[in-house]
């Protein structure tokens, strides 16, 4: 539509031709419901890939501008555009159409120009700072406009930017110059450019008006004046690339200048080029967010926008709705009508846009030159340095932007009518202003009449008068309602206040009344005196009596309630008569509905019903489909025609001659058909025909011709920045670096965290003797016997056979751990001497006071209660605590009750006076966890109770992890390594006979004391190698019992079974060292030499003659106790599972038999012995401790706290001795030696048991060797096949790993060869096997069982079974000893002990811990000249008949290796030179039968190549921590011989190009990895972890 306006302004007549552009947009389908509407899933905005047809028809007419009589130019365009926007949110479904029309007026009016042929002029926008100019901006712009209007020749000279634009693409500075830190251009001038922009290819041209722009209305418009005919494309100005390119794209317009998008992101242009139809100037775009472009060109909506658009981060691809207004003279009413009637637009995607969006309205005002002012809410955050923007900031605070008008204060409202699913109204804050209001924009709302609302109305664009009226009425109603509500509420409050006051008044009155009543009662009772009656009696009147009665009654009732007056119960009253029947109770509440019952059984079938009446006739069914055509019918019968009429008779002719008979005439023609009969009745409906077969599939049609290529879609908005991706997988582990040089030993580590509660400290010094106790009742004085003659020493028996390995057993729960003891040859018992005559019984002494606290000892414990008396307190957790280094050994030879705790309750009493510290290097210390729950285990025949649920691992050579639950139970400590046993000393002289107790002579004097073992607060210590044998010591007296203890410990530590666990591959013997003090984790130090001296002093002070020879040794007592105890208990197990104490005491009472003379009984044999064995002849025995004297003394401690600290050893010893002498125990001469006994409990076994109990040091040295016994066979029922098959099936399987260090002690082993033990093993072989299996599969043990044993070492000389002299046995040459250690991540750990002894370990973050303890013999040792157990020892026959511990250890560990325990750990082993070993055993055929050939090949390869091999292990799973390059010195002297250690050459830096010497490598398949590690450790090669891939690489240098 064309509207012609005439304007009188500044003396020039301006005639405008208003061109109306009608844009018809047809929406071909509605958006899908619920669909997200943007192609970018990340941006969360609108997509859908729909199509929108848009017909844009622009009517252009030549507009002329008449100023001073000259025609300006022709600014007309006409174009028709049909565009398909492929990325619109509306799908292209032809079913639904949505049309809308937009009428946009353009005014191509140039006002005030002085030249007819020049382009419209605009003041040049300057972006430089105006601080250097002295004039204000308003004045400056005014002067420039006037100058440009006056002189047309110089009009373009100042407009540098516009001139560059006219030069085409050579221009590079249309936009303001700005640094990369600014996101907005900083305009310093107002502009008069008023071109209008639509984001969706509709364009509106503005009016070029050369009036002065008010400086208060800042415009962020980039201004240019293009002559008609020049076109310019989108100008990108990205912050990163400061380049500018003017793209002359395929714009349909004659003069379209696109704005300068300032994208912080490096996105595409904000407004897609080539979509506007008329000369249009796009405003400056400022994308403050990395979302998509602001004016979303991809959504082909008809929204229009002008000038600045600020896009918020929350609305990517939001359609910016703007207003196209035209600033003509407001005196022309027609223009205002046009403004409201035609400048309407529609947001199609309004439903999908966020509700609170900032949509700026960019308004052109009449006098300001159609400036688009934007007021985004965050504009105050931008850094503009000009006062223009400061003014704008003051005017543009709110997100609801403002429409600004200048000249006459009229508010030009723009209506946006949304025809989408919901038309959302937006409120805008319209401010009327003179020439300088701040401006903002926005869109939305519904239309309304002009000026319907006052200027302050926040919704002036949408409110009509009736809406205002309705709003006012509703507001008044609301206020009235509030008023009435408040009035009613006030009334209620007033009434409530009155009520409260009334209640308060009444309450106070009641209180006053009560108080007065109470006062009056007191006055009545107390204030009046009783009257004196006539008889002289005091009396009260009736009222007072009543009050007194009430008072007394109340008091009595109160007392009765308190229970003070309750008397004794009276006799039971007679039963009363039955009362009348009560009334019927009310009906109870209905109960909860019961549970739905089960369905009842099916009832009987009912009778058949009578025939029902026929139903009504149903409706006629649908007609069936046409059936298939029936077969052709049979031919019908022939038709019968009627005979024709007979013809008339002919005249008779002349009778001729008879002719030839004629032929038969033709048949007559058929008659006509008869009439059709009536139709017959309708036949019954035919059956429905079958569905026909599907037809043949038609041929494929010809390929259609390709459709025309669609128009290129507009570029979509830039998506949001993607979220950071997931973290990539870790890269492959790099090659292991070169091995660094061994660093110096690190400083001592910091003190570890505070350990758990330590064991009870050493008992204090002996206190002063207390006052004498009350004298006891005098005992019956027995007849004083004559002093017996000392017995002659018995002849030494033949050397005994080595016994079964000792076992250190602890119990915690159902798992027991057994460390095989060393097989020492138990000496046969010497024959007991002849009994001496009993001496006279002494007087009973006074009971002495206990001086050591509140504890008791074992002997007191036994004497405190009758052995036959039942005891209720059968076990305590503290009983089972084995204090190796804390408690004092119990009494020496006089203690007759030694091992009554073998099977169950620890009868340990309180600790005695503080013993001296023991020898060093006790490999373990067991502390029962007192918090462990009680667990009851059922064993055959008896019910035992065990304490503790976790398997108590004795960490020999290895510390439990600090986080494991066993850490509290087990504390291991090592100081220095024990020395090896010295050479056997000469046999000691036989002691003289005095009391008849045969105590062997002690070992010789000790050698020089060696260096003190290094103590550490850590629990990782490696025992060093043993020293060389010391010189034989001279015989000593019994006073050296402290040395005996040391010797016991030394023997125990040097026993083969302990060495096989403590040591890896053994080195040569080191120098002997003396025992050093043992330092525990808690820092306490024990010296066993001092301990021995204290025990000896106790024996001496007890009145016992030390030098005397006694025919009954403590071994007899121990053996008797053990034998009888086992015979009664039916099995054997040490201080872990317990009998109840009464049974235990009864057993000990019956077991303590002292056989003084007679022929010795045969020793206990295999599984047959059920009677006492091996003590002596059949002399009747007497219980030693059954006397009342000893019982009475010990009973107090049974009830006490079960500790040993308060026991008076002197008194206990004297009581026991006096009881023995008074009870007629005859200690006679020794009898002849008995016949060789069957193998009994080995001496080392008893030693090992006693080392872990309270009874260390009690047992004297063994007697002379007895004759060899018959070897037992307790293990014959368990074969290596059972073990290996179990290991394959019992879950001990994982990915194979290299061997590790030796592990902890094994489970409770089978009983040895003593009679009861063998019996137990024979009867419980299955349970033992299950125990072994459960132990081996427990995670605690699996973490320890790592390293395989080496091949057997060289055969050593046969040892002597007697205790060797302690001289030099612990001496060690400290000068040749060096020990360095470093435990760190990935570092190497090595140590060399003494003369080439090897000890090493490494602890990485994965917790692997290696240990090697080189002792002088091969793995498993050859103590008696053969394999384990000696040449003909009880266990030396292998698995078929006996048990070869060496073979068993090798096979079990190899099987564990094969099953892959402790995968990924490896150790570099390099041992010291050793002597060449004998020929090794054959290949590992039973377990590793498949690897025999591989073994030979590998050995040949190793021998042929060189000495050092690097084994690259490939751990299957990443080992936590760096075990790579962990190297542990672990040599095998037998196989390594005397060759020197050959180090691997590792260069300094891998980066410098230097590498390791080029190896020749052989790859092994993965299944042979365990073998490679076994061989590597066995042959002392370097083992190195390297994550190479699928195979192990054996590389030789």
Curated annotation (Swiss-Prot):
Region (Nonhelical region (NC1)): 1573-1597
Ranges facing Cytoplasmic side: 1-468
Region entry Necessary for interaction with DST and for the recruitment of DST to hemidesmosome, spans: 146-231
Residue ranges, annotated region (Nonhelical region (NC16A)): 1-567
Alphabetic keyword roster: Basement membrane, Cell junction, Collagen, Disulfide bond, Extracellular matrix, Glycoprotein, Hydroxylation, Membrane, Repeat, Secreted, Signal-anchor, Transmembrane, Transmembrane helix
Biased composition (Polar residues): 58-96, 111-120, 170-184
Ranges that cross the membrane: 469-489
Record's compositionally biased regions (Basic and acidic residues): 9-19, 1537-1557
Comp. bias intervals (Gly residues): 665-674
PANTHER family in UniProt: COLLAGEN ALPHA (PTHR24023), COLLAGEN ALPHA-1(XVII) CHAIN (PTHR24023:SF891)
Protein name, entry field: Collagen alpha-1(XVII) chain
High-level lineage: Eukaryota, Metazoa, Chordata, Craniata, Vertebrata
């Amino acid at each position: 539509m064309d509207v012609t306006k005439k304007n009188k302004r500044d003396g020039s007549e301006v005639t405008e031709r208003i061109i109306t552009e009608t844009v018809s947009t047809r929406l071909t389908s509605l958006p899908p419901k619920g669909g997200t509407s943007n192609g970018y899933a990340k941006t969360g905005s609108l997509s859908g890939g729909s199509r929108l047809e848009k017909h844009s028809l622009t009517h252009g007419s030549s507009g002329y501008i008449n100023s001073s009589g000259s025609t300006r130019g022709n600014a007309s365009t006409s174009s028709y555009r049909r565009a398909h926007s492929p990325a619109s949110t509306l799908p292209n479904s032809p079913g639904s159409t949505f049309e809308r029309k937009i009428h946009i007026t353009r005014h191509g009016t140039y006002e005030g120009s002085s030249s007819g042929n020049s382009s419209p002029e605009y003041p040049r926008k300057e972006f430089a700072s105006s601080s250097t100019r002295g004039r204000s901006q308003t004045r400056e712009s005014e002067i420039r406009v006037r100058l440009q209007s006056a002189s047309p020749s110089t009009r373009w000279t100042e407009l540098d930017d516009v001139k560059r634009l006219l030069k085409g693409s050579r221009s590079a500075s249309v936009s303001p110059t700005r640094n990369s830190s600014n996101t907005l251009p900083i305009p310093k001038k107002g502009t008069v450019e008023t071109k209008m922009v639509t984001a969706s290819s509709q364009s509106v041209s503005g009016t070029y008006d050369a009036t002065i722009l008010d400086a208060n209305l800042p415009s962020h418009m980039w201004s240019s004046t293009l002559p008609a005919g020049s076109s310019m494309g989108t100008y990108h100005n990205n912050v990163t690339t400061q380049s500018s390119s003017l793209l002359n794209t395929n714009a349909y317009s004659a003069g379209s200048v696109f704005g300068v998008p300032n994208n912080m992101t490096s996105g595409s242009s904000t407004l897609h080029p080539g979509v506007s139809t008329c000369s249009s100037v796009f405003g400056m775009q400022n994308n403050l967010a990395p979302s998509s472009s602001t004016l979303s060109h991809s959504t082909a909506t008809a929204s229009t926008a002008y000038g600045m658009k600020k896009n918020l981060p929350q609305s990517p691809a939001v359609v910016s709705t703007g207003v196209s207004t035209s600033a003509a003279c407001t005196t022309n009413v027609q223009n205002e009508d046009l403004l409201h009637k035609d400048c309407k637009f529609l947001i199609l995607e309004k439903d999908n846009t966020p509700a609170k969006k900032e949509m700026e309205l960019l308004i052109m005002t009449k006098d300001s030159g159609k400036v688009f002012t934007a007021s985004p809410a965050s504009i105050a955050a931008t850094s503009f340095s000009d006062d223009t923007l400061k003014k704008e900031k003051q005017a543009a605070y709110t997100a609801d932007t403002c429409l600004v008008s200048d000249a006459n204060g009229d508010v030009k409202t723009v209506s946006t009518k949304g025809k989408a699913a919901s038309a959302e109204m937006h409120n805008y804050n319209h401010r009327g202003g003179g020439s300088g209001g701040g401006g903002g924009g926005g869109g939305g709302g519904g239309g309304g009449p002009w000026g319907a609302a006052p200027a302050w109305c926040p919704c002036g664009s949408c409110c009509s008068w009736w809406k205002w009226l309705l709003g006012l009425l509703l507001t008044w109603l609301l206020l009235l309602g509030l008023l009435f509500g408040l009035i009613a509420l006030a009334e209620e409050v007033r009434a409530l206040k009155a009520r409260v006051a009334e209640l308060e008044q009444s309450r106070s009155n009641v209180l006053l009344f009560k108080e007065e009543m109470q006062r009056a009662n007191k006055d009545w009772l107390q204030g009046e005196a009783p009257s004196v009656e006539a008889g002289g009696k005091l009396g009260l009147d009736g009222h007072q009596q009543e009050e007194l009665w009430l008072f007394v009654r109340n008091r009595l009732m109160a007392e009765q309630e308190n229970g003070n007056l309750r008397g004794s119960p009276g006799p039971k009253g007679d039963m009363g008569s039955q009362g009348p029947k009560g009334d019927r109770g009310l009906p109870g509440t209905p109960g909860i509905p019961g549970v739905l019952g089960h369905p009842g059984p099916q009832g009987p079938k009912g009778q058949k019903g009578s025939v029902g009446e026929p139903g009504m006739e149903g409706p006629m069914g649908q007609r069936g489909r046409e059936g298939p055509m029936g077969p052709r019918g049979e031919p019908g019968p022939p038709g019968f025609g009627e005979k024709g009429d007979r013809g008339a008779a002919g005249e008779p002719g002349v009778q001729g001659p008879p002719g030839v008979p004629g032929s038969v005439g033709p048949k007559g023609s058929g008659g006509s058909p008869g009439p059709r009969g009536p139709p017959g009745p309708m036949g019954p409906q035919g059956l429905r025909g079958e569905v026909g077969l599907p037809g043949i599939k038609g041929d494929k049609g010809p390929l259609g011709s390709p459709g025309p290529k669609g128009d290129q879609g507009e570029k979509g908005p830039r998506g949001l920045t993607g979220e950071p991706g997931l973290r990539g997988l870790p890269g492959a582990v790099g090659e292991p670096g070169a091995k660094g040089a061994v660093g110096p030993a690190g400083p001592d580590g910091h003190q570890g965290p505070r350990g758990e509660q330590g064991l009870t400290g050493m008992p204090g010094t002996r206190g002063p003797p207390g006052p004498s106790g009350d004298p006891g009742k005098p005992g019956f004085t027995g007849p004083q016997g004559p002093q017996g003659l000392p017995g002659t020493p018995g002849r030494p028996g033949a050397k005994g056979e080595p016994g079964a390995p000792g076992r250190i057993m602890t119990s915690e729960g159902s798992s027991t751990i057994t460390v095989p003891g060393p097989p020492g040859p138990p000496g046969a018992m010497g024959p007991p001497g002849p009994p001496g005559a009993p001496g006279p019984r002494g007087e009973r002494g006074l009971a002495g006071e206990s001086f050591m606290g509140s504890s008791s000892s074992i002997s007191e414990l036994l004497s405190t209660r009758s052995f036959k008396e039942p005891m209720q307190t059968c076990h305590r957790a503290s009983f089972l605590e084995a204090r190796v280094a804390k408690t004092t050994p119990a009494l020496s030879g006089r203690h007759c009750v030694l091992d009554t705790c073998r099977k169950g309750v620890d009868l340990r009493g309180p600790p005695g006076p503080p013993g001296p510290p023991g020898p060093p290097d006790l490999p373990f210390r067991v502390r029962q966890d007192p918090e462990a729950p009680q667990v009851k285990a059922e064993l055959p025949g008896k019910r035992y109770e065990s304490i503790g649920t976790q398997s108590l691992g004795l960490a020999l050579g290895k510390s439990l992890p600090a986080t494991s639950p066993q850490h509290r139970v087990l504390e291991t400590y090592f100081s220095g390594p024990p020395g090896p046993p010295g050479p056997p000393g000469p046999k000691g002289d036989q002691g003289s006979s005095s009391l008849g107790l045969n105590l062997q002579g002690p070992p010789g004097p000790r050698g020089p004391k060696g260096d003190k073992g290094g103590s550490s607060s850590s629990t990782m210590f490696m025992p060093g190698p043993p020293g060389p044998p010391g010189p034989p010591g001279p015989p000593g007296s019994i006073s050296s019992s402290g040395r005996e203890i040391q010797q016991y410990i030394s023997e125990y530590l040097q026993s083969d079974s302990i060495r096989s666990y403590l040591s890896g591959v053994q080195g040569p013997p080191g120098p002997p060292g003396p025992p050093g003090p043992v330092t525990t984790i808690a820092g306490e130090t024990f010296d066993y030499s001092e301990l021995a001296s204290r025990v000896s002093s106790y024996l001496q002070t007890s009145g016992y003659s030390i030098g005397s020879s006694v025919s009954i040794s403590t071994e007899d007592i121990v053996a008797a106790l053990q034998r009888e105890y086992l015979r009664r208990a039916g099995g054997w197990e040490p201080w872990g599972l317990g009998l109840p104490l009464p049974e235990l005491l009864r057993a000990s009472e019956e077991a303590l038999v002292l056989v003084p003379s007679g022929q010795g009984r045969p020793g206990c044999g295999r599984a047959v012995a059920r009677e006492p064995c091996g003590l002596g002849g059949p002399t009747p025995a007497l219980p030693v401790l059954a006397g009342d004297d000893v019982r009475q003394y010990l009973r107090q401690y049974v009830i006490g706290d079960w500790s040993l600290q308060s026991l008076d050893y002197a008194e206990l010893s004297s009581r026991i001795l006096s009881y023995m002498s008074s009870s007629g125990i005859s200690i006679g001469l020794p009898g002849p030696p008995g016949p060789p006994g069957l193998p009994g409990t080995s001496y080392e076994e008893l030693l090992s048991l006693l080392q872990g109990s309270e009874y260390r040091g009690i047992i004297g040295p063994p007697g002379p060797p007895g004759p060899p016994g018959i070897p037992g066979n307790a293990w014959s029922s368990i074969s290596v096949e059972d073990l290996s098959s179990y290991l394959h099936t019992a879950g001990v399987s994982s990915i194979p790993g290299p061997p590790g260090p030796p592990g902890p002690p094994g489970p409770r082993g089978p009983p040895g060869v003593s009679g009861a033990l063998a019996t137990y093993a024979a009867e419980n072989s299955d349970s033992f096997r299950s125990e072994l299996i459960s132990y081996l599969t427990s995670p605690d043990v699996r973490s320890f069982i790592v390293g395989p044993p080496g091949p057997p070492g060289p055969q050593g000389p046969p040892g002597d079974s007697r205790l060797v002299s302690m001289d030099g046995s612990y001496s060690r040459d400290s000068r040749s000893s060096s020990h360095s250690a470093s435990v760190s991540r990935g570092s190497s750990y090595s140590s060399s002990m003494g003369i080439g002894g090897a000890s090493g370990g490494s602890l990485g973050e994965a917790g692997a811990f290696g240990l090697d303890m080189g002792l002088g013999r091969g793995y498993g040792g050859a103590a008696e000249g053969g394999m384990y157990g000696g040449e003909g020892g009880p266990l030396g026959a292998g698995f078929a008949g006996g048990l070869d511990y060496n073979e068993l250890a090798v096979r079990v560990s190899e099987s564990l290796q094969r099953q892959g325990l402790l995968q990924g750990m490896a150790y570099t082993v390099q041992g010291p030179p050793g002597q060449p070993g004998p020929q090794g055993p054959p290949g590992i055929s039973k377990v590793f039968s498949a690897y025999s050939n591989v073994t030979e090949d590998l050995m040949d390869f190793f021998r042929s190549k060189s000495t050092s091999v690097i084994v690259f292990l490939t751990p299957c799973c990443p080992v936590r921590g760096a075990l790579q390059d962990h190297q542990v010195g672990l040599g095998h002297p037998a196989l390594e011989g005397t060759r020197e250690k050959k180090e691997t050459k590792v260069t300094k830096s891998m980066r410098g190009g230097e590498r390791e010497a080029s190896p020749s490598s052989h790859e092994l398949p993965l299944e042979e990895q365990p073998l490679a590690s076994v061989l590597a450790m066995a042959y002392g090669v370097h083992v190195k972890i390297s994550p190479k891939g699928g195979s192990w690489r054996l590389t030789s240098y």
